[in-house]
Amino acid sequence: MTRRRSRPSGGAGRRERARAAGPQKPQAPEPPPPPSLEAGAGAGPPEAPAEPDHDGPREDDEPNLVPGPQVPPASSQPVQTCCLLCHRERKGWEEGPSQNGLVLQGEKLPPDFMPKLVKNLLGEMPLWVCQSCRKSMEEDERQTGREHAVAISLSHTSCKSQSCGDDSHSSSSSSSSSSSSSSSSCPGNSGDWDPSSFLSAHKLSGLWNSPHSSGAMPGSSLGSPPTIPGEAFPVSEHHQHSDLTAPPNSPTGHHPQPASLIPSHPSSFGSPPHPHLLPTTPAAPFPAQASECPVAAATAPHTPGPCQSSHLPSTSMPLLKMPPPFSGCSHPCSGHCGGHCSGPLLPPPSSQPLPSTHRDPGCKGHKFAHSGLACQLPQPCEADEGLGEEEDSSSERSSCTSSSTHQRDGKFCDCCYCEFFGHNAPPAAPTSRNYTEIREKLRSRLTRRKEELPMKGGTLGGIPGEPAVDHRDVDELLEFINSTEPKVPNSARAAKRARHKLKKKEKEKAQLAAEALKQANRVSGSREPRPARERLLEWPDRELDRVNSFLSSRLQEIKNTVKDSIRASFSVCELSMDSNGFSKEGAAEPEPQSLPPSNLSGSSEQQPDINLDLSPLTLGSPQNHTLQAPGEPAPPWAEMRGPHPPWTEVRGPPPGIVPENGLVRRLNTVPNLSRVIWVKTPKPGYPSSEEPSSKEVPSCKQELPEPVSSGGKPQKGKRQGSQAKKSEASPAPRPPASLEVPSAKGQVAGPKQPGRVLELPKVGSCAEAGEGSRGSRPGPGWAGSPKTEKEKGSSWRNWPGEAKARPQEQESVQPSGPARPQSLPQGKGRSRRSRNKQEKPASSLDDVFLPKDMDGVEMDETDREVEYFKRFCLDSAKQTRQKVAVNWTNFSLKKTTPSTAQ
């Protein structure tokens, strides 16, 4: 029919027009309705016949509602295209509300019209509102929109769906009770109704979908399940509308339905939603619409009126909101309930404001789970967005459309819900950012709670735990008591834990005592046999314990010694420099080779506390260099190596190696360590290493004179003096320091060496490994002019060597008499060696980790094995240490490395 004609052409067109003419909603009812009517006619000719019966009177009452697929054949007249409420042509609407249950523009539905609406709905009365319906709806909406603006937030999403349902229902009723009519009327409605008119297309489609899935559902939710798709839906629609005044709750209940209905209704409002209705069985769309409309009516108090006014009321609520935004009947259609409802349902129009709010709920639809349909369709959402009077602006803003669009973009519509609930929300309710204040409040609360808890916990916890009878020490109890305020609960727990621990300890003690008694009994019973067995069995453990305790004590002593040497870092630096210089001098002469060992022995023996590390360095560096550069002009770095040549001697391999052999030394660092072991155990590495103590001590003295004879004699002289001092003075490091001081003066190595020396303590056992790397590096340095580098390298090498050489020195110090004419230094060395032995545990890491000289020392098999093992570890670790050599450049750069070296 004409209405169909309008619907097919105006289904989508109306939607577009509705969007474009959203601002025109007041006028939209009539102009859009013709397309809506055309669409509705196409879609709902059957509806038109059905609607005339139900909506005839309404059509008469509502000539504006004429446009609408729901208009009966008589109502197919394009008086006003289709009314969104009635979706009927003007004629259909003109037929009068009595016929179609539609209210004429000027006519308001009487309160008793609800039965008529029910009948009309059963007869598929048109739901879409004509201009008159829309105007009435707008008025009612304006009145009730403000009242229900708040209620609309939840209900008006339902209202949307209901309004949409009503609109589609009205159009469906107008078209015919046949399902096809309803579906066509839905399309007609959508065609007549501007998509932005009332509900989002998504909402409508959702409403329609849910009604389609169960047309009676919306109706049932409204309390009037749709019967036949056409009739039943109108009935449910009527019931819903009758219930609409109450249904503001229902809208919430119907929100899900509106979600389905609204998308369909957008179909009725806009061609797309209407097609949705069409795809669905008309009956289902109608029930959906009916239920939807009822939902809208329920959401809006006026909806009952709309139901009475051939479901125009339910849509009139939207109409009131939507029509002004929408131009032509399509907007009225979208607000079909509003237009028709306004007349019969002035109170429902307040509900209709809910639908108009429903527009906002369009947004709210997406805001609320119930109103999921609300914002789904951008078009209806616009219509939905307006709350009461805001509806027009909302639809104009097309906030629903924008909301859905923005939602897609991750944004949200500007509806009040979104604004309030923070899609594009204003900042959340201001919360105190005064964290200190909050913290204090929380703290005070916690303190109060703790105070209360201690009272409770004291009584409760005290009852079970009897803190008075606590097993903890008095000090612990006092601490606990004193700290109760801050940690009452914690202390209670801690007290429990402590008690448990004490109990466990007591149990363990009791068990141990019992075991001891048992063992004592056993031992007494089988003590003699057991001692042999147990001793044999326990011997390894005891030996391990003894060795471990000895090593740990030694390690501690070594650590202390290292710390002392680091503390004396400046003097140690000087010593290192002197030792290095001396090593260099010694390196210049072959004798220094032996001298460095004596140096090592002397320095390690004499400076074990400070320079235990240095003495090993001295050994490593002087020996290496003395052996390496006995006759070379590397006296400076020979002095630098002075400590290292002993290493070279200890190594024995680089006797002819030049100072450049710093690299060799480095490579031979492991050999140095092993040779240090040699020096200690096997004398073969060097003559002085044969008798490390005696030879080294003499070699120390020799080294002093030899360095003098070799290049860098002033340093040698100093070195000699320093070595003599070393031999004389228990702390050999200081003489090396004096030697170093000259070399430091001559070379920058003094300060650098201190860092190295400092680091040497750090390096400790690792220094040996580093020593190898140092050896190679410092070797070039020594070969090079910078004694500093050489000294550093040698002292560092010596450091590792020192660790190794120190045991050698200590061991060699004991046999210090052999090669050195100056027996006093030897004797001192020996005494130093003894001292070192005594101090080793506390003085030197080398003492702990470096193998001792096995030759001149009496050892148990266990100790000897331990020493062999140490040597093995040194040999293997040396290489590794070489690989893991420290970046000595940093140390040379940092004079404060001694502390870091620790």
Swiss-Prot record:
Keyword list, A-Z: Coiled coil, Cytoplasm, Nucleus, Phosphoprotein
Pro residues composition bias: residue spans: 26-36
Subcellular localization, as worded in the UniProt entry: Cytoplasm; Nucleus
Gene Ontology cellular-component annotations: cytoplasm; nuclear speck; nucleolus; nucleoplasm; nucleus
Main location: cytoplasm
Modified residues (Phosphoserine): 773, 785, 892
Segments of skewed composition (Acidic residues): 382-393
Free-text tissue specificity from the UniProt record: Isoform 1 is up-regulated in both embryonal rhabdomyosarcoma and alveolar rhabdomyosarcoma cell lines.
Region (Disordered): 1-79, 159-192, 210-319, 382-409, 581-655, 679-854
InterPro entries recorded: FAM193, FAM193_C
Compositionally biased intervals (Polar residues): 306-317, 596-609, 618-627
Stretches with biased composition (Low complexity): 170-185, 263-283, 682-701, 775-786
Coiled-coil boundaries: 490-524
Family: Belongs to the FAM193 family.
PANTHER family reported for this sequence: AGAP004327-PA, PROTEIN FAM193B
Name the UniProt record assigns to this protein: Protein FAM193B
Organism: Homo sapiens (Human)
